[in-house]
Amino acid sequence: MAIKVLVVDDSSFFRRRVSEIVNQDPDLEVVAVAVNGKEAVEMAAKLKPQVITMDIEMPVMDGITAVREIMANNPTPILMFSSLTHDGAKATLDALEAGALDFLPKRFEDIATNKDDAILLLQQRIKALGRRRMYRSSSLTPTSTIESRRSTIAAPETNTPRRPLSSRLASTTTPVATRSSLSTTSADRHSANPTTSSISSIRASGKQYKLLLIGTSTGGPVALQKVLTAFPANYPHPIVLIQHMPAAFTPAFAARLNTLCKIEVKEAENGDVMRPGCAYLAPGGMQLMIERSGISGRLKVISGTQEMNYKPCVDITFASASKAFGGDVLAVVLTGMGADGREGARMLKSVGATIWAQDEASCVVYGMPQAVASTGISTHSISLDNMAEAILKESSRG
């Protein structure tokens, strides 16, 4: 049965084109369109769509207000369309905090010119959000309660890469991988649905860590906010965050996290020397590498090859960390589409690093975490509600 979609936008052109694109996919069906947030709230209650696409700036009622009302009364997966501006980034983050699950840049030229990748991406995102049941987390931030959802593994966010990942990682400016380090092992035959580890079952390893890595995609802004706001100002290690996000969005996201967290959060800059208690967010549209500099680490921001599906790419950063810090790394893969992070995590594990994944039930999209959990790369699958406590418990021994 096709996933029922409600399209909300005050632009008649955008409503028509989004509806056409959605209806091109036999697994999707537009059941109605709305011209403002007020109509969206009413139609969500009446029609019970499985996914809503939502504009932000609309008359009568804006998209953010509509998201709040829908999530309060008829919780539904919502995909926001956002302009690639500083104000657009801030508004999108507000919408995600209000309960929207994902966003896409609102590019009229892509929609108008029938760009295949833009069409496929929209269809994939809607299908990923439509394959889920409700999951209610405890309060995700000091200021709001956000909904999370469960889903089956979703398709990648973009088309199939032109070259194997091993060669694409090797083509970055810092050698980070060998073909043998990417080979499939017996761990790849592990269960596709690992059980969730309780806090009591996670025993601190006593390892002396030097770095915490967190990689994520769809659902990541809310998940990162929940985890990082629980960290004390004196968290003992540097933190590197890799979130799939456009270049216009990462400065605003880093600034928002910095205002909410006790630790310092900043967008990573080329040459940054990593400090304990500071989180460095990979800049959108670039690749973030980690290099060893004495007893600490230094960050290198590069443009990277165009053949990588993601900028920033979790695999790239994880792989560079395996070379720079070896086993002295705790790496966590949170909610996200696709499998970015799996091969980088495999490299980290091969040198003795600790890998954890978010559990299926608390993910917005169980793609990236499943990629490391089902292959046996991660040692624990942990609920988002327990992730910060688990990280602090493990880090305290470092």
Curated annotation (Swiss-Prot):
Its EC number is 3.1.1.61, 3.5.1.44. It comes from the Bacteria. Phosphorylated by CheA. Phosphorylation of the N-terminal regulatory domain activates the methylesterase activity. It is found in: Cytoplasm. Pfam families: CheB_methylest (PF01339), Response_reg (PF00072). The modification 4-aspartylphosphate is found at residue 55. Its main location: cytoplasm. Residues 133-200 are annotated as: Disordered. Residues 4-121 form the Response regulatory domain. GO terms for cellular component: cytoplasm. Residues 205-398 form the CheB-type methylesterase domain. HAMAP family: CheB_chemtxs (MF_00099). Involved in chemotaxis. Part of a chemotaxis signal transduction system that modulates chemotaxis in response to various stimuli. Catalyzes the demethylation of specific methylglutamate residues introduced into the chemoreceptors (methyl-accepting chemotaxis proteins or MCP) by CheR. Also mediates the irreversible deamidation of specific glutamine residues to glutamic acid. This is Protein-glutamate methylesterase/protein-glutamine glutaminase. The lineage of its organism: Bacteria, Pseudomonadati, Pseudomonadota, Gammaproteobacteria, Alteromonadales.
